[in-house]
């Protein structure tokens, strides 16, 4: 089995820094669920993106991410995190 790493964009880290600890814990637990096989959570493939972006729903938050592969390491790159109404703009 490949090793799985999680990387965050600057935008995602900035959003997490503004949340309370409980909310950050919920989001990080959901992102950790992506490392399972099969991934756990309400996941849908996003249309209109050729890089294979997917979205994970956690309550009213949406986590936009994509999978990247580097030799024996699978990377889950978290592109953005935001509220349902603002994340798709």
Question: Model-predicted segments: where are they?
Answer:
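Surface-exposed, Lys/Arg-rich phosphate-binding patches that contact polyanionic backbones
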Residues: 15-22
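Glycine/serine-rich loop-strand microenvironments at binding/catalytic pocket rims
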Residues: 23-27, 38-40
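Basic nucleic-acid-binding interfaces
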Residues: 1-3, 18, 45
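A short beta-strand-loop micro-motif that forms or neighbors metal/cofactor-
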Residues: 28, 36, 75
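Enriched for short, Lys/Arg-rich terminal
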Residues: 1-10, 22-25, 56-61, 66-89
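A short, surface-exposed loop/turn module that caps and links secondary-structure elements
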Residues: 32-55
